[in-house]
Curated annotation (Swiss-Prot):
Keyword Lipid metabolism recorded: yes
Protein's GO biological process: cerebral cortex neuron differentiation; lipid metabolic process; negative regulation of Notch signaling pathway; neuron differentiation; neuron projection development; Notch signaling pathway; positive regulation of cell cycle; positive regulation of neuron differentiation
Disordered, as annotated region: 582-607
Complexes and interactors: Interacts with PRDX1; forms a mixed-disulfide with PRDX1, leading to disrupt intramolecular disulfide bond between Cys-25 and Cys-571.
Disulphides: 15-18, 25-571
PANTHER family: GLYCEROPHOSPHODIESTER PHOSPHODIESTERASE DOMAIN-CONTAINING PROTEIN 5 (PTHR23344:SF6), GLYCEROPHOSPHORYL DIESTER PHOSPHODIESTERASE (PTHR23344)
Residue ranges that the UniProt entry lists as topological domain Cytoplasmic: 1-42, 111-125, 182-192, 518-607
Family: Belongs to the glycerophosphoryl diester phosphodiesterase family.
A Gene Ontology cellular-component term: perinuclear endoplasmic reticulum
Protein name, as recorded: Glycerophosphodiester phosphodiesterase domain-containing protein 5
Upregulation: Up-regulated during neuronal differentiation by retinoic acid. Down regulated by high NaCl or urea.
Task performed by this protein: Glycerophosphodiester phosphodiesterase that promotes neurite formation and drives spinal motor neuron differentiation. Mediates the cleavage of glycosylphosphatidylinositol (GPI) anchor of target proteins: removes the GPI-anchor of RECK, leading to release RECK from the plasma membrane. May contribute to the osmotic regulation of cellular glycerophosphocholine.
Length: 607
């Protein structure tokens, strides 16, 4: 009777098992392989890198446009007919997808670092394709439907590029450990040269990126202009329902420079404040008068409009995620808000703030279609509100407006040639923050034209515009921006130059050190060991050399351990092949103790 014990025993490799198991479901030792990665799996790795780049760009873009989330929701409301905050779910989904892809990429890089064969599991491949397709569709949709918003990406880079550059240097320096390992393992000089040239071309490209960075916040502190004046967009819509008395009062409590309002005229000729064409979003008209829900707000009498509640929607939809922060008294006050008339706003703001007024055209069959401008002007003049504090944005019949109210600040909402602006006696421009460059701001200032930019909610954007010298901004988030004491960062050019040159030198020194260390660690390794000879779960091409090497390792351990029979002591090349084929599914396992040799014990009874 013959009893056999295992030829070898290997210690468990939990980290390696988790690495290959999570990435390719290769949890067992015999499933892992140090063979070269197949071309197909290399293609999947390339696809993984591309997906990572796209999801990173998309996530950064979606974070960058958080200043315009309300605008995005408003756009979808006009398309879909009901209000919902889509921005946060998209942000959460994008972050989750990026985290998943980043995790797969880290696992793949770890495979390369330890010399394991890449074999992405089919479930991960499906997830990769779904995320890639979804990201491409999302980016294409934004490019077609929200094209101007891509300019926000470039604007945000003016504020973040100096710091993203430092992060990129950290990443490329860490990646050099893997590249240096591949360089050290490469046996051909041509392969080493290719790896070296390609990697350092990328590295030096990263080092020179700061030469292309231009930011208004890279400036001398003494050149920083005054803080931009703040204009409350429809009051303070993050603290109270927009276009209500409470909203304007909250804005005035912050001592803002001005208030912005959209003026509509009722069926019986009363100017009131409303941004939407209908009343569905900002009132309870669907509950109180369902038959009037889709009728234009301008086609209702003021007596009907006064009966509507203009505050409950704010608590229900919570458009800015701020309703929970209201005090109990503010919560009760919000529930009792009604539509605000122009006369109420004029009385509230008189002597306290300037007004940026925009008129909305009534429907074609409105009785005041031809005279709504005169009615509005008369209401402003009758209130006694100081004319020099009114910024008049409505672009039609400006000669009539200048005649009736010569003190108004004529404000244009479009970019035009300077000759046309002067011809129209334009004193101020009201533009979206993506429509004007730093150089254009300087040009307008030299022409004695003041510029107001809308809608600026994020502190980073406010800081960037502050450094650029913007005179004033319109904001939903005035209560936060009013407390910003200075730009989030400002750096003299000399200090910035010193910072990025120092960072480049440190990175380069570390990379050289890593290459030297990896060459010293791995450059002399040319022999096989039992840990590096494993069978792959995938079908591989047969290799006579590998089979013979396995047999040599096994029989060298047998000869060192105990005596064996003559039948096993002499092996020809053909016996190697026969034995290898018979044991093609067996994998040796590592030593029980580090540095110990595997032992074989063969006991034969009757001999």
């Amino acid at each position: 009777m013959v009893r056999h014990q295992p030829l070898q025993y290997y210690e468990p490799q939990l980290c390696l098992s988790c690495l290959t198991g999570i990435y390719g479901c290769r949890w067992k030792r015999y499933q892992r392989s140090h063979d070269d990665t197949t071309p197909w799996e290399r293609l999947w790795f390339l696809l993984l890198v591309c997906t990572f780049s796209l999801t990173l760009t998309w996530l950064y873009f979606w974070w960058g446009v958080h200043n315009d989330y309300d605008e995005f929701n408003w756009y979808l409301y006009n398309r879909m007919g009901y209000w919902s905050d889509w921005s946060v779910p998209i942000l959460v989904t994008s972050a989750a997808a990026f985290t998943y892809i980043a995790g797969l990429l880290v696992l793949a890089l770890c495979h390369i670092a330890v010399g394991q064969q890449l074999n992405l599991h089919w479930i991960h491949k499906m997830g990769l394709v779904v995320i890639l397709a979804s990201t491409v569709v999302a980016m294409s949709a934004v490019a077609q439907l929200w094209e101007d918003e891509w300019e926000v990406l470039l604007i945000s880079l003016q504020g973040t590029a100096p710091f993203l550059h430092i992060g990129a240097l950290v990443a490329i320096t860490a990646l050099s450990w893997i590249v240096a390992g591949q360089f050290a393992r490469a046996e051909r000089s041509s392969s080493q040269l290719t790896i070296l040239c390609t990697f350092f071309a990328v590295v030096f490209t990263f080092y020179l990126i700061p030469l292309t960075i231009s930011s208004p916040c890279i400036m001398e502190k003494k050149d920083l202009g005054p803080k931009p004046a703040l204009i409350g967009h429809r009051g303070a819509p993050m603290l109270a329902p927009e276009h209500t008395v409470m909203s304007f009062r909250k804005a005035l409590e912050q001592r803002l420079y001005g208030l912005q309002a959209d003026i509509t005229i009722s069926l019986d000729g009363v100017p009131f404040l409303m941004h939407d064409t209908t009343l569905r979003r900002t009132t309870n008209v669907e509950h109180l008068f369902p038959e009037l829900a889709r009728r234009p707000a301008a086609m209702l009498n003021w007596t009907v409009l006064q009966r509507l509640n203009a505050g409950q929607w704010f608590l229900k939809t919570d458009p800015f995620w701020t309703a929970s922060s209201l005090s109990p008294s503010d919560h009760r006050e919000v529930q009792n808000q009604s539509i605000c008339s122009l006369a109420e706003l004029l009385e509230l703001a008189k002597g306290n703030a300037s007004l940026l007024l925009n008129l909305r055209d009534p429907p074609r069959d409105h009785p005041y279609r031809g005279s709504f401008l005169n009615v509005t002007l008369e209401a402003v003049l009758r209130s006694g509100f100081p004319q020099h504090q009114v910024m008049w944005l409505f672009n039609r019949q400006r000669p009539l407006v200048r005649k009736m109210a010569p003190g108004f600040q004529q404000t244009s909402g479009s970019k035009e040639a300077i000759a046309n602006l002067r011809k129209g006696h334009i004193q101020k421009l009201n533009l979206r923050y993506t429509q004007v460059s730093h150089q254009e701001l300087r040009d307008y200032a030299s022409w004695n034209l003041s510029v107001n930019l809308y809608t600026v909610n994020a502190p980073w954007l406010f800081s960037l515009l502050w450094c650029a010298g913007v005179p004033s901004v319109t904001s939903d988030n005035s209560h936060t921006l009013s407390r910003v004491p200075s730009p989030l960062w400002i750096m003299p050019p000399d200090e910035y130059c010193l910072m990025w040159v120092t960072a480049d030198l440190i990175s380069f020194s570390l990379i050289i050190g890593i290459f030297v260390l990896q060459k010293w660690r791995l450059g002399g390794i040319r022999s096989y060991n039992p840990e590096q000879i494993m069978l792959s779960a995938a079908v591989r091409r047969t290799s006579r050399d590998v089979s013979i090497m396995k047999e040599k390792l096994i029989f060298s351990e047998i000869s060192d351990g105990v005596e064996v029979s003559d039948e096993l002591s002499v092996c020809s090349d053909s016996s190697y092949d026969t034995y290898a084929n018979a044991n093609s599914t067996a994998t040796p396992v590592g030593p029980r103790n580090a540095g110990s040799r595997a032992k074989t014990v063969t006991e034969q009874s009757g001999h």
